[in-house]
Amino acid sequence: MPDGSGHMQPYLDQALDGAASFAGAGTGWIDALRRAGADAYGAHGLPRRRDEYWRYTNLNALADEEFRLANGAPAIGLPSLPHKSVAELATYRVVVVNGRLRPDLCALGGLPDDVLVAGLEDLLNAAPARLEPYLGKIIRLADMPMAALNTAFLRDGMAVFVGDGIVLDKPVHLISITALGEAA
């Protein structure tokens, strides 16, 4: 077994065992994508410094950490956002907490009709065909073990679709927060 993969195997098993409750479960291509991520990570394990993309990053400390699936986003309000001035910028604000889109913290009023900002979980359940041309298409999972691990645990996130010819009047600002707590 590759370095680092044995330590993560219980978490991979947990993800695959729980995958039936993940968004989009039962949709063939989504199930296959998650399985491909788990298989690719299992074949490689944690990246090592001898891997070209990771030569300056030592991930050995991760081998000693215990992980568990996040069961939701902890209570975070607008005042908790980093740098209060960030929340006041003239942008379309998108907030993701622990990998989950938080519509209550977003400021998307005025987006054109041909622009959709949605939670990945919602799209995986309601419109998986809209995601199929994109998910799992940019990289080879066998070459990117951390992306493979992330793919095995695919549950939520955010997606932005912009129609042809659309030019926004202000930028989309993504604020991604990782928060510890009971839900993390």
Describe the role of every protein-language-model region:
Residues M1-A184:
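Glycine-rich and polybasic anion-binding loops at the starts of cofactor/ligand-binding domains
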